[in-house]
């Protein structure tokens, strides 16, 4: 297993340990981490800026079915389903880059603005950044009307680098 270091803040991603806060279980190889992932400590550097400091790349160990089994511990309550301290397992299909290829970026689908469903606001529990579905976020590439659930799961908060999982439904207080 390899270790990769952020050149700015010296954060180290260790494949053998993973990064559960970011959604990467132990033994998650560097190659399956999304290309647009950013450093969880400083949010200044992207994956491509990290430096291999120990071990070798595990690209040859990716299975041909492009599937990764993930087990994650949920440590805070989910607003909608009230999940708390539960272990969840999931099987995630991955686009795996082979030598000489790049992962294909995908744009989220945009919900029809005329659908009649109310747009919601989501707040980052780490820094307070608010994502408003009605406004979208053109800097991040999300058109007005882009639903939060349509944003890629590997998206990071543009202000602090927190994961999408660190956002909760924002409810404005009236009066």
Curated annotation (Swiss-Prot):
Among InterPro entries, the record links this protein to: Rubredoxin-like_dom, Rubredoxin_dom, Rubredoxin_ET, Rubredoxin_Fe_BS
Of the GO CC terms on this record, one is: cytoplasm
Asked if Repeat is a keyword of the record, the answer is: yes
Which keywords belong to this entry? Answer: Cytoplasm, Electron transport, Iron, Metal-binding, Repeat, Transport
Its required cofactor(s), as named, are: Fe(3+)
Segments forming a coiled coil: none
Do you know which SUPFAM superfamilies this protein is assigned to? Rubredoxin-like
What does the record list as GO biological process?
A: alkane catabolic process
Residues given in the record as Fe cation 2 binding sites:
124, 127, 157, 160
Q: Does the keyword Electron transport belong to this entry? A: yes
Main location, first listed in the record: cytoplasm
Q: Which Gene3D superfamilies does this chain map to? A: 2.20.28.10
Q: How is the cofactor bound?
A: Binds 2 Fe(3+) ions per subunit.
Question: Superkingdom of this entry's organism?
Answer: Bacteria
UniProt subcellular location: Cytoplasm
Record-level Gene Ontology MF annotations = electron transfer activity; iron ion binding
Alphabetized PROSITE patterns for the sequence: RUBREDOXIN, RUBREDOXIN_LIKE
Pathway listed for it is:
Hydrocarbon metabolism; alkane degradation
**Which family is it part of?**
Belongs to the rubredoxin family.
Its name, as the record gives it, is: Rubredoxin-1
Q: What taxonomic classification does the UniProt entry list for its organism? A: Bacteria, Pseudomonadati, Pseudomonadota, Gammaproteobacteria, Pseudomonadales
